[in-house]
Design a protein with these regions (language model features):
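Basic phosphate/pyrophosphate-binding loop/patch that engages nucleotide-derived ligands
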Residues: 6, 213, 304
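Gram-negative/organellar outer-membrane beta-barrel architecture
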Residues: 79, 85-98, 104-267, 271-274
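Periplasmic POTRA and POTRA-like interaction domains that precede
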Residues: 2-74, 99-145, 179-183, 271
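Short beta-strands and strand-coil junctions in structured, solvent-facing domains, enriched
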Residues: 53-54, 68-69, 121-123, 148-149, ...
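C-terminal outer-membrane beta-barrel translocator/porin domains of Gram-negative envelope proteins
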Residues: 238-245, 249-328
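Short, histidine-centered active-site or binding-site loop motifs used for metal coordination
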Residues: 63-65, 190-192, 277-281
Length: 328
C-alpha cells in the first residue's frame, strides 16, 4: 500500500473569478505530479513505526536507496521497491509507505514514513496422516518467526509413525542473505523410514543440508547424509542385502521448477514441471556413495465441473554409478 501526498490544491487568488458553487473543477493531482515529478528534492527523514522485534539494521539496508533519491519520481520508485522488499521477508502482516512534504524550513525536501505490522512470533501446527505405505503418523511442528529480529524463521518438526518410521527436523531459514534476493535454508535432520511391508528393510538417515533459493525457479542444494540400511526381518532381497550397513553421501543438486498450480496440495488447476540433477560423491572420502542422477516430473490438474477434478502426473529418471560403485 502506497500513499503519495504532493501538495494541497492552491487557493483561489483574489483577482480570479471563482466558479459557481457546486461546479468547481476537481483539482488534478496527476497533472500536478507530472509537472513536478522531475523537480530536484532531498529526503529529509525516513521514519519506521511498528518495529517491535525487527532490528533497525534490516530497515537501514532496505531503505538506504530511499535516502539517495534526487527527484520526486525517483523517490516514488524507491519507495515502491522498498515496500516490495519488506513484504518479501514474510515477517509483516502489513507494510505501508507514505511520502509527504518536508518541514517548511527545508524547502524541496520530503519525509518518508514506513509503518509495519509484524506477524506473530510463535506458530504451532499438528495433524494425523496416512502415508502411501499405509502407515499412520502424527505430525507436530513449532515455528518461531523473527524472534531475534533478523527476519529469520526457525522450525522444529516431529513426525512419528505407528510403526518404526519417524522424522525430526530443525530448519533455519534466513531470507535475503547479503540484502540480495537469495534465501538460505539450513536443516539438520534424522529420518527413519520403515519399508518392512513392501521391501523388508529399514533406512535411517542423519545429516545436514543447505539450500539456496533465488527469486527465480532454480534452487541449489548441498547435503551431507549418513545412511544406515538394516534388515530386521531377515527377508530382504539380495539387492537390498548388498546395500546393508552404513554409507556416507555428500551431494550437490540443482532443481529447476515451474509451478503454475492453484495450490500445492490437491490442486484443481494448473501444472507443475520439475527437473532435478544430483551429483553425489563430492568430497575427499573415496568410500562415499558416488553417482549422477537426473529426474524429470510433470503434473497437471483440470476441473471441468464443480466437484470433478482430473489429475495426471508422470516422473522419469536415470542414475549412473560413478567411481568404485560403477565397477561393482
Amino acid at each position: 500500500m502506497m500513499e503519495l501526498t504532493i501538495a494541497q490544491a492552491p487557493p483561489t487568488s483574489p483577482g480570479t473569478m471563482s466558479e459557481p458553487e457546486g461546479q468547481k473543477k476537481p483539482y488534478d493531482y496527476q497533472e500536478r505530479y507530472r509537472h513536478v515529478r522531475q523537480k530536484p528534492l532531498s529526503v529529509y527523514s525516513v521514519e519506521v513505526k511498528g518495529d517491535e522485534r525487527t532490528r533497525p539494521g534490516l530497515f537501514a539496508k532496505v531503505l538506504d536507496p530511499v535516502y539517495r533519491a534526487t527527484t520526486l519520481d525517483e523517490l516514488r520508485v524507491r519507495c515502491v521497491e522498498a515496500n516490495a522488499v519488506l513484504n518479501s521477508y514474510d515477517i509483516f502482516d502489513r507494510v505501508d509507505v507514505e511520502m509527504d512534504a518536508g518541514p517548511r524550513e527545508h524547502p524541496d525536501s520530503a519525509k518518508v514514513t514506513v509503518e509495519v505490522s509484524e506477524k506473530k512470533k510463535l506458530s504451532l501446527k499438528g495433524g494425523a496422516y496416512v502415508s502411501q505405505q499405509g502407515e499412520g503418523s502424527m505430525e507436530v511442528s513449532v515455528g518461531l518467526n523473527n524472534a531475534l529480529g533478523y527476519a529469520e524463521k526457525l522450525d522444529v518438526e516431529f513426525i512419528k509413525g505407528h510403526e518404526r518410521s519417524s522424522s525430526y527436523t530443525l530448519a533455519w531459514n534466513q531470507p535475503r542473505v547479503g540484502n540480495v534476493d537469495v534465501d538460505v535454508v539450513t536443516r539438520a535432520f534424522q529420518q527413519v523410514s520403515c519399508s518392512k511391508r513392501l521391501s523388508s528393510f529399514d533406512e535411517t538417515a542423519r545429516g545436514i543440508s543447505v539450500t539456496a533459493v533465488g527469486g527465480g525457479p532454480a534452487t541449489v542444494d548441498y547435503s551431507l547424509v549418513w545412511r544406515e540400511i538394516a534388515d530386521p526381518t531377515r527377508l530382504a532381497s539380495k539387492s537390498v542385502r548388498h546395500q546393508l550397513g552404513h554409507s556416507l553421501k555428500s551431494s550437490v543438486s540443482y532443481t529447476y521448477q515451474v509451478d503454475e498450480r492453484d495450490r500445492p496440495v490437491r490442486p484443481q488447476a494448473g501444472y507443475l514441471a520439475r527437473v532435478r540433477s544430483e551429483l553425489a560423491g563430492v568430497g575427499w572420502d573415496t568410500q562415499m556413495t558416488k553417482f549422477l542422477k537426473h529426474e524429470a516430473e510433470i503434473q497437471a490438474a483440470h476441473t471441468p465441473a464443480e466437484g470433478v477434478t482430473f489429475f495426471a502426473s508422470a516422473k522419469v529418471g536415470a542414475m549412473m554409478p560413478l567411481g568404485q560403485n560403477a565397477k561393482d
